[in-house]
Amino acid sequence: MRLLDEPVNLLLSIPALLWAISFHEFCHGFAAKMVGDPTAERQGRLSLNPLAHFDLVGTLMLLFVGFGWAKPVPINTRYFRHPRRDIVIVSLAGVAGNLLTATLTVFFLRFFGRAWVSLTGEPGFAVLWHMIRINLGLAAFNLIPIPPLDGSRVIEAFLPYKYLYHYRWLEQYGMFILLVLVASGIINLFFDPIFNALWRLTMWQLLSIGS
């Protein structure tokens, strides 16, 4: 999933990269607002502007490694009426946004792909291909249950209360653990199965729709 294999490939991936990051965080903020938390909106993060969600390290990771993250949308669980349920909704909203984008791109490619390619050529096809790959990559990466990724919030919501203290203690080291796993390549043991499952499902949609 590396994007820096060639300069042209990098340039063609930029629209998908900006959209995937922006929409992912927007969905978090929108879901939080729907369950009662106005924090993201008040801080100007309920936006599709990539600059509102830009994280230098996470973006460089996306470019050089193939997966990464944006600046997390601020969430205040004190506003949640049903904290455990609502944190799952908010945490999975970003992933859902990326999967929705990938699915809609597949639909577009399936029904309008020939016309699109005839108008835009190989670069136009590459833009759509990156839109699918990057959104699936961001979704898969965020499903990994390691703090501070979205998957960890889902795990936290289902943990018995007696384990929450220990899990939240681990969170303060989450970013360090994550970077070590990425640098060592161990992260692929988590990432690859999730991404491959999402990729196979997406390709099945592409091949089966309208057949």
Regions found by a protein language model. Name each.
Residues 1-211:
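Hydrophobic transmembrane alpha-helices and their immediate loop junctions
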